[in-house]
A protein has these predicted regions:
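C-terminal motif of bacterial Sec signal peptides marking the signal peptidase cleavage site
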Residues: 14-15
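Structural register within alpha-helical repeat arrays
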Residues: 38, 45, 79, 121, ...
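Residue-level recognition of tetratricopeptide repeat
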Residues: 38, 72-73, 154-157, 195-196, ...
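TPR repeat positional signature
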Residues: 42, 76, 83, 118, ...
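Inter-helical turn/loop elements of alpha-helical hairpins
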Residues: 55-57, 79-113, 121-135, 168-176, ...
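Solenoid-like repeat scaffolds
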Residues: 66-68, 148-150, 189-191, 221-228, ...
Length: 506
């Protein structure tokens, strides 16, 4: 009996550890914080989830830590951090400010370490009152740099400094700053190869075709290190898309989307908890493999989800999936092309994507009046939003969301307008004007930094121009522009087919 009791005790310990591993496989972080023993596991889980951008679940974990220890200062720090989504252009200033007020009330009575006090000061800079968001982001990053120098061996300080660098770039990419972030992330990984933040931020730092191969090892590792974070299962596909690794894009996003469904069922959530982002990338992967049947089913499923829960998030993704399907398949006369979407309250970039699809459909049908109507709507929309952006928005003490127009949104919209204007000119047999608009769309694209993932400009400018050049029997020029398109979209099926067509037509 004695040996049996020992065996049972060991079995229970192993079983508990296995269960913990299965449910909380989120990576490894090393940080000591002040708090009671019941609060610490919740804090650690929140920190791990925070590094994988699982903001809602991270917030829930930090709130549990607060409940276990209402005077645990770092639990308030963590919750406040969940309201800043630096790489998604989102910030909930008001809710963060409420948490920081609570923190200020308890922090004066609570003994905290010097490191904790420094991190608390950092988060106050991130939400500094009466200060524009851009200024706050830069100030926060500069302060994190000072902490990085002060605590050179602290992996968490390094990780959040790396992220702050990426977040200090207001729009697009800055290779110098992103390279600096990558260097810091790689330094962490040398000491802790299972750090979820370092893996995650390294992938973001190298998320373009020119650098993607430098993060391939991190991409392959991240989903294994943090498989219980849906976003960690998706993130490797950023590198896989940039390298044209379509089978891996598909497998990554199947896993990520399924993880979101598991969470949805576990927490009894609505359709908005579905991983629509991964769902869109999965559709794109299928289309690059020529699996149009599965992709079409996904668009129809997305239509159904949006009908059941007609949120902004759902409607945005109907536009995304519809647009990706149509531009990749050219099925402008099918049922997908006729799916309506209420875009009135969406970002101008999404609205212009939808208008582009309507314009392309009109062009394919030779419906000049419809195309003119679409172009007029786009022009008025662009003027109105340009005025709003020119007036500026101080972002002193308000939420920042993706609904608000940015300079990049306006330029992307202008690209789509010029593409449709080129096609309109072709319908009018004005080939010179058509070419001018095609070239202008390319020039605008060249002024922007690389946009990762499925193309935001659904029909990339070099690719659409090359398609048009083929119709003009200018095959060598078409081949040149297909090659240029391939640099931004390695392995894209329509580009590869276009290159083959230039050879056949000659």
């Amino acid at each position: 009996m004695k040996y049996l009791s020992i065996f049972l005790a060991l079995f229970l310990i192993v079983s508990c550890k296995q269960k913990e591993k299965e449910t909380d496989a989120l990576g490894v972080v090393n940080i000591s914080v002040t708090g009671n023993k019941n609060a610490l596991p919740h804090f650690k889980k929140g920190l791990l989830l925070l590094h994988s951008f699982e903001y809602e679940d991270a917030r829930e974990a930090f709130q549990k830590a607060k409940k276990e220890d209402p005077e645990m200062a770092m639990a308030y720090w963590g919750e406040a951090m969940t309201y800043n989504h630096s790489l998604w252009q989102e910030q909930d200033y008001v809710d963060a400010a409420i948490v920081l007020e609570q923190l200020d009330e308890i922090n004066s009575q609570q003994e905290t370490t010097e490191l904790e006090n420094d991190l608390i000061e950092a988060v106050h800079i991130l939400y500094k009152p009466k200060t524009e968001k851009k200024e706050r982001d830069i100030g926060y990053s500069e302060f994190m740099e000072s902490l990085y120098k002060k605590y050179p061996a602290n992996q968490e300080v390094a990780a959040f400094y790396a992220l702050s660098l990426l977040g200090s770039v207001e729009e697009g990419r800055d290779d110098v700053i992103y390279g600096k972030g990558a260097k810091i992330a790689k330094g962490i990984l040398k000491e802790n190869p299972n750090h979820p933040g370092a893996l995650h931020y390294l992938i973001h730092s190298y998320d373009d075709p020119n650098h993607a191969s430098l993060a391939l090892d991190a991409a392959n590792a991240y989903s294994k290190v943090a498989p219980d974070a849906s976003h960690a299962l998706h993130m490797p596909s950023h590198i896989y898309v940039a390298m044209g690794m379509w089978d891996d894009v598909i497998s990554s996003n199947i896993a990520s989307y399924q993880a979101s469904l598991n969470r949805m069922e576990k927490k009894n959530l609505d359709n908005d908890s579905r991983g629509y982002h991964a769902f869109h990338w999965l559709e794109y992967g299928y289309l690059q493999k020529g699996n149009q049947e599965e992709a079409k089913k996904m668009v129809l499923d997305m239509k159904k989800y949006a009908a059941e829960t007609p949120s902004k998030k759902a409607r945005v993704h109907v536009v995304f999936l519809k647009g990706t399907y149509l531009t990749e398949t050219d099925e402008w006369d099918g049922e997908i092309a006729n799916i309506p979407v209420d875009i009135t309250d969406l970002n101008i970039s999404v609205r212009s994507q939808y208008h582009f699809l309507e314009g392309m459909k009109a062009f394919k049908e030779g419906n000049i009046s419809k195309l003119d109507s679409v172009l007029n709507t786009m022009e008025q929309d662009h003027k109105r939003e340009s005025f709003v952006v020119a007036e500026g928005s101080s972002k002193l003490c308000s939420a920042v969301t993706r609904d608000e127009a940015t300079e990049m949104d306006l330029k992307e919209s202008e690209i789509r307008q010029n593409q449709l204007m080129a096609l309109r000119a072709e319908l009018n047999n004005d080939l010179k004007l058509a070419e001018e608009h095609f070239i202008k769309s390319i020039d605008i694209e060249n002024s922007l930094s690389f946009s990762y993932g499925p193309p935001s400009i659904q029909k990339p400018p070099h690719e659409l121009y090359a398609d048009w050049l083929l119709t003009q029997n200018r095959n060598e020029e078409a081949a040149e522009h297909y090659s240029l398109a391939l640099k931004n979209g390695p392995g894209r099926l329509r580009i590869l087919k276009g290159i083959e067509n230039t050879k056949q037509v000659i």
